[in-house]
């Protein structure tokens, strides 16, 4: 493996990875979300996580006020209440601070039950 490929693999291993699980709360367009953060194959603990959302199909028309996530019960788990403006595809923006500073964008389709991952 050459030096550039090795450096790239090290950087990618240290880049935070996130998964999102959102369930409808029973209120219109309100979801209870669980974010799982990993870094280098290990749970990312001690992060300050802010979750926001933008609707890609309507730039600057629908933007959700960011909410601060709270630590969950498992390592790398964070929970937040996400209040959207309508159903459809949303770009979920995770801002991370603390042991790592980064921003992750996840694309999800929200319906009346919850959220499903989408490709950007």
Give the location of each predicted region.
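Sec-dependent N-terminal signal peptides
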Residues: 4-12
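Contiguous segments within soluble domain cores/interaction surfaces
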Residues: 13-120
């Amino acid at each position: 493996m050459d030096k550039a490929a090795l450096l790239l693999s090290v950087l990618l291993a240290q880049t935070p990875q996130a998964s999102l699980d959102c369930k409808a709360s029973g209120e219109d367009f309100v979801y209870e979300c669980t974010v799982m953060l990993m870094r280098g194959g290990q749970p990312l603990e001690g992060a300050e996580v802010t979750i926001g959302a933008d609707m890609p199909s309507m730039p600057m028309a629908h933007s959700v006020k960011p909410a601060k996530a709270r630590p969950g019960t498992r390592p790398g788990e964070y929970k937040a209440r996400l209040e959207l403006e309508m159903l459809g595809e949303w770009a979920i923006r995770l801002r991370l601070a603390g042991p790592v500073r980064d921003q992750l964008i996840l694309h999800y389709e929200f319906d009346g039950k919850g959220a499903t991952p989408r490709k950007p």
